[in-house]
Amino acid sequence: MDPLKAQQLAAELEVEMMADMYNRMTGACHKKCVPPHYKEAELSKGESVCLDRCVSKYLDIHERMGKKLTELSLQDEELMRKMQQGVSST
């Protein structure tokens, strides 16, 4: 595959993944923090604080999971490299 096309595809996938994460986060936090029947047009103080905390936690967990998955991926790559070296040296 052409490197430019691969880079473009990776960028498109990243945008799609970020949009998916945003949609899940807003849906989950809205469901948790905002009652289904609105009393007022504006968010209450409690709803606003709840949404702020929910989004903060969601983003924190997303970042932690990304770091852990990267770490595991690097470990897998290292293991595969060692296995290939072991096979090629015999």
UniProtKB/Swiss-Prot annotation:
User: Where does it live in the cell?
Assistant: Mitochondrion inner membrane
The lineage's top-level taxon is: Eukaryota
| Cellular component, GO annotation | mitochondrial inner membrane
The UniProt entry lists membrane topology as: Peripheral membrane protein
> One biological process GO term for this chain?
protein insertion into mitochondrial inner membrane
Q: Which cysteines are joined by disulfide bonds?
A: C29-C54, C33-C50
Gene Ontology MF annotations? metal ion binding
Enumerate the UniProt keywords alphabetically: Chaperone, Disulfide bond, Membrane, Metal-binding, Mitochondrion, Mitochondrion inner membrane, Protein transport, Translocation, Transport, Zinc
InterPro entries annotated for this entry? Answer: Tim10-like, Tim10-like_dom_sf
A Pfam family that this protein carries is zf-Tim10_DDP
Span of the annotated motif Twin CX3C motif: 29-54
The record's similarity note reads: Belongs to the small Tim family.
Comment, domains? The twin CX3C motif contains 4 conserved Cys residues that form 2 disulfide bonds in the mitochondrial intermembrane space. However, during the transit of TIMM10 from cytoplasm into mitochondrion, the Cys residues probably coordinate zinc, thereby preventing folding and allowing its transfer across mitochondrial outer membrane.
Query: Could you give the subunit structure recorded for this chain?
Result: Heterohexamer; composed of 3 copies of TIMM9 and 3 copies of TIMM10/TIM10A, named soluble 70 kDa complex. The complex forms a 6-bladed alpha-propeller structure and associates with the TIMM22 component of the TIM22 complex. Interacts with multi-pass transmembrane proteins in transit.
Q: Tell me the function of this protein.
A: Mitochondrial intermembrane chaperone that participates in the import and insertion of multi-pass transmembrane proteins into the mitochondrial inner membrane. May also be required for the transfer of beta-barrel precursors from the TOM complex to the sorting and assembly machinery (SAM complex) of the outer membrane. Acts as a chaperone-like protein that protects the hydrophobic precursors from aggregation and guide them through the mitochondrial intermembrane space.
Q: What is this protein called?
A: Mitochondrial import inner membrane translocase subunit Tim10
- Name its species: Xenopus tropicalis
